[in-house]
Design a protein with these regions (language model features):
Chain A
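A short, proline-enriched helix->beta-strand linker immediately N-terminal to the Walker B motif
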Residues: 165-169
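P-loop NTP-binding/switch modules centered on Walker-like glycine-rich loops
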Residues: 172, 176-261
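Conserved ABC ATPase "signature" region
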Residues: 124-141, 194, 250-251
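Helix-to-loop junction immediately C-terminal to a conserved catalytic motif
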Residues: 63
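Conserved ABC transporter NBD signature motif
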Residues: 71-81, 85
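Short catalytic/signature loops enriched in Gly
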Residues: 3, 16-23, 28, 231-317
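Conserved ABC ATPase signature
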Residues: 146-150, 154
Length: 317, 317, 308
């Protein structure tokens, strides 16, 4: 069985014009660098990283908004740039206030993917919108209303209903909870979970919040400076992180009532993606860095004794 | 920054070159024919002579070639001969330019002074009665046709009150400064009133924004008197950017000057161009129009550069 | 942010209803609306009035120049003995018609160019913007005059057509539109640029929407507000342009009246019959100031801050 979406050495490079008096030479920003992974049917893959890690850009490529500069994507083993792929992969955004066209009523907003894909008659679409609106927990009369009449959490529900309209196989959720109040976050999170269980959806769940990831993910992929540094099933990753960066991320999550396991302090700041460090991208901040880390790029390989857990480190645990 | 300057200057020259071709072609489309005008009223002219004349003046050549000849001559300083003035074009341009400069500078300065006074007064209490009255005045200023304003002023000051002369430049005996001022008064007043409206709005907006800033609150807390705050601090900060915008309005100012000169029979660039077009004086019309274009473009460039210098965000592009 | 209308739950509180309510509160704008309606009635009454009085607005009568208002001529006669009131009304038709049509033509061109530049981006945007900036930088009136002085016969039109009233009308519409589309283009481009990056546009793209769909379904509806405001203000500007050009003799040419060309020789009769110098300009002034106030009211009504 081929995976739902496969990424093969996918890169996203941007050319940036230099600054300065006469304009410097053009530089290349490697937002995403040679990432390979696969998303299966019905699984939730969490994509974790700090800002500047490239996770949003990766999400855009999976959603079909951006073509990769290098590498390729596959949908169910076949080509990616097809109408079927666009229908099957939908997107939910971070900012609920920007995600909905203020000029359209909710019924049109939800039905829009159907209109774009040419699915169903107008009556059928309206019926579907009515169904979806209730499934995401909003009252029926929302259909005639406009986005500005709803709160952030409610708008996010509408956005989710829109993503569900064409009966997708995968939803790319780019930090869908970050802009919401904490009390609303758990509501939306539960909504996402229940939807997945009902429909056997896959999620590419992009987040920087490890607590949420722990709640929802089946597997976790960790990005640093555009590179995939660790890819593991959820339980393993949280129990025994293999890559030093993952370890540092987990240690940074405050846990009430429990002493920290170990102190892994990261030195320095994340380098600019315009000038990534040679060799292993993480070596400038890594407490374990050695000469080899600067010279050789580590490949993703299984951690000792745990073949499901992949890390890109010369000294993975 | 240097790159920015060079780029903008190059753009200006390019536009000027393109415009020179466009205007050259348009002049050719004006009613009448240079040869016909030359031989007007001369019964002994035969078609053979006309053809010969055409050859001599190069009028049988295609347009791009004729343009090229003109361009080469112009770059060498030869702008041709003005038929209606019986002088080389350059000798006509000089005094006309001086007259227009006199009118425009005086008018512009008056506008600026009035605008700063009115705009500041309006900004002191936004929404108040004075602000509303000044607002009405500015709306009137931008809605009034300049030539009609001139007529009304003539009606009031010249015809009814006999305070000022209705037109012309100086008395027959060239009666010194006072006489020149009397003749300049109505045209300057017309030009100034027409532009004060827009300028006042700029000043008002800039002053309102400046007065809201924290450093004004500090000045108040220090116990400085209100007039001192408004003039010494707020006004000074609002001055430069506002004056820059006002300088940008050069193009509109020139158009207003054109009308004013024509109405008041003042021999400036505007009237010169207008008469030249009506009188089929092709050389003069062409040179005059191009000069007007050059001056407008140059002032826009100067304003852009000043803007770029003022706002560090722009200059780093 | 809570739902605003708890009373009428089933009533769609559409964006337009909100706007109308806000507009009504702006008193000067409402007054301007009334004034403009009155002006429209005024110019529309030209035909009926001429029929009623049995007068020909173009008929000159050199024996009755500068007559004072009378029963036959309610506002007197002009410098050629023509009825002043009728000429004001017909002139108004011309000036308003040029204003509206030139705005529509120029606005459409500006809209198309702004959308193309804003949405396509890249080289197309750069090229279009360079051109726009070039035109904006030119001195308008001299350029309009040169364009207005063009002899249509040299462009291949027949002499009869070139001198007809229709040619004169379309000439000035084309000239003004040619020169005035830049403001609209810039505005639309800025709006399109900001819309392009919004998430709902990205969502539509992710579902497979092409550029045409996005432009018509999302960008255009969201730029209607600045377009309407800009369009209204453009009408005022265009009316002023036409009046200046006609006044200088390069726009609408007599005998067809326009408010501008009625002041053609105003300097001659400003002493003999000041009324003739006042009326046409006053009408231009009232129309333009009303249009400007209307635009201002629309701008306040469309305030996007309350419609996030």
């Amino acid at each position: 069985m081929s995976a739902l979406v496969e990424l093969d050495q996918v890169s996203a490079h941007f050319t940036v014009r230099g600054s300065g008096w006469f304009g410097g030479a053009k530089q290349v920003l490697r937002a995403v660098d040679a990432v390979s992974l696969a998303i299966g049917e019905g699984e939730t893959l969490a994509l974790v990283g700090e800002s500047g890690s490239g996770k949003s850009t990766l999400g855009q490529m999976v959603a079909g908004l951006r073509a990769p500069t290098l590498g390729s994507l596959r949908f169910r083993g076949g080509p990616f740039a097809t109408k079927a792929a666009r229908r099957a992969i939908q997107l939910v955004f971070q900012d609920p206030f920007s995600a909905l066209d203020p000029r359209m009523p909710v019924s049109s907003l939800i039905a829009e993917p159907l209109v774009i894909q040419g699915i169903g008659t107008q009556a059928e679409r309206r019926t579907r919108a009515a169904l979806l609106v209730e499934q995401v927990g909003l009252p029926r009369d929302s259909l005639n209303r406009y986005p500005h009449e709803f709160s952030g959490g409610q708008r996010q529900r509408i956005a989710i209903a829109r993503a569900l309209a064409p009966e997708p196989a995968l939803i790319v959720a780019d930090e869908p909870l970050s802009a919401l109040d904490v009390s609303i976050q758990s509501q939306i999170l539960n909504l996402l979970k229940s939807i997945q269980e009902e429909r056997r959806l896959s999620y590419l769940f992009i987040s920087h919040d490890l607590g949420v990831v722990n709640h929802l993910a089946d597997r976790v992929a960790v990005l640093y400076l555009g590179k995939l540094v660790e890819l593991a099933p959820r339980a393993e990753l949280f129990a025994r992180p293999s890559h030093p960066y993952t370890q540092a991320l987990l240690d940074a999550v405050p846990r009430i009532g429990r002493a920290r396991r170990r102190q892994v302090a990261l030195s320095g700041e994340m380098p600019s993606p315009l000038a990534p460090p040679p060799g292993c991208v993480f070596h400038t901040r890594c407490p374990k860095a050695q000469a080899i880390c600067r010279a050789e790029i580590p490949l993703l390989a299984p951690a000792p004794g745990r073949p499901d857990q992949l890390a890109a480190c010369h000294f993975k645990e | 920054m240097l790159r920015f300057i060079l780029r903008r200057t190059a753009q200006t020259f390019l536009v000027l070159l393109v415009m020179s071709f466009v205007i050259y072609s348009l002049i050719g489309l004006m009613p009448g024919d240079p040869i016909d005008v030359m031989i007007a009223g001369n019964p002994g002219v035969t078609p053979a002579m006309v053809a010969h004349l055409r050859e001599i003046y190069g009028l049988d050549q295609p347009l791009p070639l004729r343009y090229w000849h003109w361009l080469m001559a112009a770059l060498g300083g030869d702008l041709g001969f003005s038929r209606t003035h019986s002088q080389p074009v350059l000798e006509v341009l000089g005094p006309a330019l001086a007259q227009t400069a006199k009118l425009m500078l005086t008018g512009w300065s008056l506008s600026v002074v009035l605008a700063f006074i009115l705009g500041t007064l309006a900004a002191l209490k936004p929404g108040g009665k004075l602000d509303a009255a000044i607002g009405l005045f500015t709306f009137a200023g931008i809605s009034v046709p300049v030539f009609w304003l001139a007529l009304i002023l003539v009606l009031v000051f010249a015809v009814t009150l006999h305070w000022l002369p209705a037109s012309g430049m100086a008395g027959i005996d060239d009666g010194g400064i006072v006489d020149q001022l009397r003749h300049l008064a109505l045209p300057v007043l017309t030009l100034a009133l027409a532009n004060t409206g827009t300028f006042t709005r700029y000043v008002r907006a800039a002053m309102i924004e400046t007065m809201r800033m924290d450093f004004i609150r500090t000045a108040r807390a220090k116990g400085l008197s209100e007039p001192r705050i408004v003039i010494g601090h707020a006004l000074r900060n609002a001055l430069i950017p506002v004056v820059t915008i006002m300088a940008l309005s050069f193009g509109t100012l020139f158009s207003g000057a054109l009308v004013t000169e024509t109405m008041f029979a003042q021999f400036g660039m505007g009237k010169m161009i207008y008469d030249a077009i009506l009188g089929n004086d092709y050389n003069l019309a062409l040179s005059g129009l191009l000069f007007a274009t050059l001056v407008t473009l140059a002032s826009n460039l100067a304003a852009d550069l000043a803007y770029g210098w003022l706002d560090p965000r722009i200059s780093l592009r | 942010m809570t739902a605003i209308d708890t009373g009428a739950i089933d009533q769609a509180s559409s964006v337009w209803q909100l706007r109308w309510r806000r507009f009504r509160r702006h008193r000067t704008a409402m007054a301007s609306l009334v004034l403009l309606a009155a002006l429209l009635l005024f110019v529309a009454a030209a035909g009926p009035l001429a029929a009623l009085q049995g007068l020909d607005p173009d008929a000159t009568d050199l024996l009755s120049r500068y007559d004072s208002p009378s029963a036959a001529h309610w506002l007197g006669t002009d410098e050629a003995g023509r009825d002043e009131l009728l000429r004001l009304m017909y002139g108004g038709q011309m000036s308003l018609l040029v204003g509206i049509i030139a705005t529509l033509v120029g606005g459409t061109v500006g809209l198309a160019i702004g959308l193309a530049a804003g949405y396509a981006g890249g080289r197309i945007d750069a090229l279009l913007m360079r051109t726009t900036d070039g035109i904006i930088a030119l001195p308008l009136l001299p350029l309009l005059i040169v364009l207005g002085a063009v002899d249509l016969t040299k462009l291949g039109f027949s002499s009869q057509f070139a001198h007809s009233g229709a040619a004169g009308f379309w000439r000035i519409v084309v000239i003004i539109a040619l020169v005035d589309w830049t403001a609209m283009a810039r505005l639309v481009r800025a709006a399109a640029l900001s819309m392009k990056e919004r998430d709902f546009v990205q969502a539509a793209r992710a579902s497979g929407a092409g550029p045409l769909y996005i432009v018509f379904a999302h960008i255009l509806p969201n730029v209607t507000t600045p377009i309407i405001v800009a369009g209204t203000l453009t009408i005022g500007r265009v009316i002023l342009f036409e009046s200046v050009l006609s006044f200088l003799g390069f726009g609408i040419v007599p005998p067809t009246p326009s408010w501008g060309n009625m002041l053609n020789n105003a300097q001659e009769f400003v002493t003999t019959d000041p009324g003739l110098a006042i009326y046409p300009g006053l009408l231009i002034f009232l129309t333009v100031i009303a249009v400007n106030f209307l635009g201002d009211g629309l701008q306040h009504a469309f305030d996007p801050r309350s419609e996030r």
